[in-house]
Amino acid sequence: METETKQFGGGLKGVRYKYIDSDEYYTPIETVEKIFSKILPHVKEKKIWFPCDNEQSAFVLYAQKLGLNYKNSSDDFRKREDLFLWCDVVITNPPFTKIPILCDLIKEKKKDFVFIAPYVRMNAIMQRFLNVSFFYLPRLFYRPDNTIERIGVVAANSFGLTNNNPLPQHEKLICEYEDETRIPILNNIKFFPQDEIAPNKMYVPLTFAMYETKNWQRIRVQDRPKVNGKDKFRRLLIQKK
């Protein structure tokens, strides 16, 4: 399998990503177990569709083990109107280039979803589902040729994303932030200010989506906000309710 290596500038300078002729990655059972440990209480009574998975998929095998109500397919999901109508929730590790298409269909059909996605695809998801939640996953995947992928676009940042909101509420985040623009930019979610002293609006890291709070509304994803003329990493604009 031929590979081409490119290097991004800006905030990703020095980080290399692999572009290969297939963006398929197979999910190991350890990753599937981690996902279901987060979402099982929310999906165990629902009809689940695995749209990018054959009978040997770790998702399918684990769903069998749990006795879940599921269907799977490995053909073109755009042509499976029957399964879109049947299911309550879509769970898969989709080809990453197909994530925007799948998101558009899920939004149109008003279905819940749980995806595996790299950081570079989070913007496409959060633009369509602003209130999506996510959690970290093991950084290990298999290529179709059965080799292991530990570095590159998959492993750099691997997240499980869901609009099913399986994450606990986190009301008391305590943080510090830069106040160098009209809208402060928070650099570390671990130092989130208490609500009573927080500004009305803030740019926060996308890891804010790992927590739920009743007092903040998500407004939009900002690709590269600036502080003193310097680009920062992608941020989420939030506002007090």
Model-predicted segments: where are they?
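Class I S-adenosyl-L-methionine-dependent methyltransferase catalytic core
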Residues: 1-91, 95-241
